[in-house]
């Protein structure tokens, strides 16, 4: 029950931050979701695969949390909860630091300020780092092979 409750809190914060920021920016007339827009060829395909994965991974996460099944030891599950929590922290700091320049995807038309302070001194895209930490952490908490394959795909696409 500890892992289930913790994972639900982690995911609520994660998706709350992501969709909350999109909502707040939409109220200001800013189109946050730029994934696959204005792209062609390989770039568009990669971004659309990533967009589809962002729909299916949460479904897999919720199913894994619901079953509360993991083939990993309790120690690795605890490590997963720490890693996923770190991912939430990185994402929240990234979104707050980026202010209104934050986008999901790159807009060809919006001219935003390049953010180079705060967490962006360490990483060019710390939000993806936060995503990956959350996905890896939840994977460790509820390890199963289906979830493993989906998580690897998302992490691979975001790194590439």
Regions found by a protein language model. Give the residues of each.
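Membrane-anchoring alpha-helices and their flanking helix-loop junctions
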Residues: 1-109, 113, 134-160
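Active-site-proximal inter-transmembrane loops
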Residues: 105-128
